[in-house]
Amino acid sequence: MANKTILFNKHLESNAKMVDFHGWDMPLNYGSQIEEHNAVRQDAGMFDVSHMTVVDVIGNDACAFLRKLLANDVAKLKVPGKALYGGMLDENAGVIDDLITYYLTDTNYRVVVNSATREKDLAWIAKQSQGFDVTVTERPELAMIAVQGPNAKAKAAAVLSAEQNTAIEGMKPFFGKQAGSLFIATTGYTGEAGYEIIVPEDEAQAMWQALLDQGVKPCGLGARDTLRLEAGMNLYGLDMDETINPLAANMGWTIAWEPSDRDFIGRKALETLRDAGTDKLVGLVMEEKGVLRHDMPVFFTDSAGVEHQGVITSGTFSPTLGYSIAMARVPNSIGDTAEVEMRKKRVAVRVVAPNFVRNGKQAF
């Protein structure tokens, strides 16, 4: 039996096409993936992300524990509510998961991890927490709704109370705040402004309906994938996993090398990889007809005339740009052109930074 979120019946009411997503019954689309994608780029859309795992890390050693657990450094977080993105690595510097950590107080942090990795993550976190004065608590009674797009904040404001709107007024990107029963964060997975709202399960259906009534379009996993890919955001399991280190997954910016005496898990292996040089994750753009797809081989010739090969990790047709885009893992000697093998022939592609669309506009 697949797991169902508290919003399952709301999806059926909107004629969602449901699919199995890592053991969860989730909406793929509600009729038109393209319309859902465009709603987020041009107006406002919402996603049921209640399958995500919310974990509270509380105790005197919460900061010290997370400084060991994560490659990014939570000690950088000084303002209550500030969030941090980064990887949780194994001893070989493979990425166990990518996650967001919110600093609430010196002894209270909230971590949001992926659903596909839930059991593995919880077991790893529990194992690593031994010896630290911390309590790690999963919060399955909380649902989550992401409201994204240029008009998302205004439409969400219409369903929030006056007190909640006052509490989050002027909140900068990548912050989260408890406002009444809701935890409202200025985070997302689309490259647009908006909120991710953690809501008690018994309030989630009413909130979903209230957002629907404000004209927020329900969006499924299909649009979520094209939006995050346009924004150059990794999908765990495709763009990185335990066989891939963060330097080869465009996550170098999330590694806090300083202070040099912070011994986070995987640090020694990662330093060795850094010094030796690793592959890198780049963006590909193909303006010819056709669609770049996961696992297609990528070829390029370096300045010395030597041919190298890489692979597409994520690819799709970009509704915003009108042509195909992809992320690919390649040797770091790549220039600004390459070829992708599709249908037994090689097609020219441009190599760009893996960030294609931000706030509705081309970003490269």
From Swiss-Prot:
Disulfide feature: none
SUPFAM superfamilies from the UniProt entry: Aminomethyltransferase beta-barrel domain, Folate-binding domain
This protein's record includes keyword Ribonucleoprotein: no
A GO cellular component annotation in the UniProt record: glycine cleavage complex
BP GO terms, sorted: glycine decarboxylation via glycine cleavage system
GO MF annotation terms: aminomethyltransferase activity; transaminase activity
Top EC class, one word: transferase
InterPro entries per record: GCS_T (IPR006223), GCS_T_bac (IPR022903), GCST_C (IPR013977), GCV_T_N (IPR006222), GcvT/YgfZ/DmdA (IPR028896), GcvT/YgfZ_C (IPR029043), TrmE/GcvT_dom1 (IPR027266)
Catalytic activity annotation: N(6)-[(R)-S(8)-aminomethyldihydrolipoyl]-L-lysyl-[protein] + (6S)-5,6,7,8-tetrahydrofolate = N(6)-[(R)-dihydrolipoyl]-L-lysyl-[protein] + (6R)-5,10-methylene-5,6,7,8-tetrahydrofolate + NH4(+)
Pfam families per record: GCV_T (PF01571), GCV_T_C (PF08669)
EC code(s) of this entry: 2.1.2.10
Keyword rRNA-binding belongs to the record: no
Taxonomic superkingdom: Bacteria
UniProt keyword terms in alphabetical order: Aminotransferase, Transferase
NCBIfam families assigned to the protein according to its UniProt record, in alphabetical order: gcvT (TIGR00528), PRK00389.1 (NF001567)
Known partners and oligomeric status: The glycine cleavage system is composed of four proteins: P, T, L and H.
Role this protein plays: The glycine cleavage system catalyzes the degradation of glycine.
Family classification: Belongs to the GcvT family.
Name this polypeptide is given: Aminomethyltransferase
Source organism of this protein record: Shewanella baltica (strain OS223)
